[in-house]
Amino acid sequence: MINVDPPTGNYPATGGNSTHNITSESDSRLAFKVKSSNNEHYRVRPVYGFVDAKGKSKLDINRLPGPPKEDKIVIQYAEVPAEETDPMAPFKAGAQQGEIIVKLIAA
């Protein structure tokens, strides 16, 4: 129900930034949550957010200096009603519907 463009993040081991677009293919509004396999070297903003039906949301990833390594982020998503104001709420309630994995490569 969502796509991420670009689907992979490539960074120098000395650090770097990338911006990705989360695009919804759903007719419903979605909430998302981003989980990282390496919180020591990656910062992601936003961690929680919304994507409107057939809409887009921007995701910024910052790679801090560190050893070359392959990591990933997992973007979990769930349908939410239009009036939902807290993007964390569906995940606290265990409402995850699907997920997509984005590879992060530092070389």
From Swiss-Prot:
InterPro entries: Ig-like_fold, MSP_dom, PapD-like_sf, Sperm-specific_class_P. Residues 1-26 are annotated as: Disordered. Signal peptide: none annotated. Residues 1-107 form the MSP domain. It comes from the Eukaryota. Residues 15-25 have a biased composition (Polar residues). PROSITE patterns: MSP. This is Sperm-specific class P protein 34. It holds the Pfam family Motile_Sperm. Gene3D superfamilies: Immunoglobulins. Expressed at higher level in testis. The lineage of its organism: Eukaryota, Metazoa, Ecdysozoa, Nematoda, Chromadorea. The gene is ssp-34.
